[in-house]
Amino acid sequence: KSVLVTALTNRALMEVAGKSSLSEVIQNKQVYKTKITSDESKEIPSLQLEKDVTPKKGCIVLATFFVSSGLAAELASETPFDYVIVDEASQALLAMLGAARLLGKQVVFVGDTNQLPPVVQLKKSKIRDNNYLRLVEGLDAVTNNGAMPLYQLTESFRLCNRAVSYTNFFYNGNLSSKSKMRFADIPNLFFMHKEG
């Protein structure tokens, strides 16, 4: 099977490539990325350079939203990848989510509508007046119509208990911490308690 993983930034793609679950395919030179910098080459030496975003059987291709959307615009009728994974999908415009559907036979959107939405440099009045709201809502627009199954993670492995207690304001108390990290009290450092 061929897999495309797409995200807003190259840094996000490097985070994906750095996951321990991918170490074997990285070492076997089965992970390709567009536009590898010298720092990225040092960080993950076995990462392969991908000049054109093309499916490779048994491999993972990493490309930004910008690069992936360019490929989608060039497609005629074929769907090149078996799977497309859109990481940080809450940051994608609706057009990018649509492009992902053109690129993959199966598509997984990984994102959280409670997190950073797409960054748009238009005034809200212009968005409203030109009827662009659905376009800039991105993942919200896709998830609100009920056309696909949704899953909400309830455990965080990065956030310690204190951080989860603040974050739970947005998650109605449904998030719990599984982090092994513990918060150290630092004298003379002030925190606003979540209860006010």
Please describe what each predicted stretch is.
Residues 45-50, 69-74, 94-96:
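A generic local structural motif
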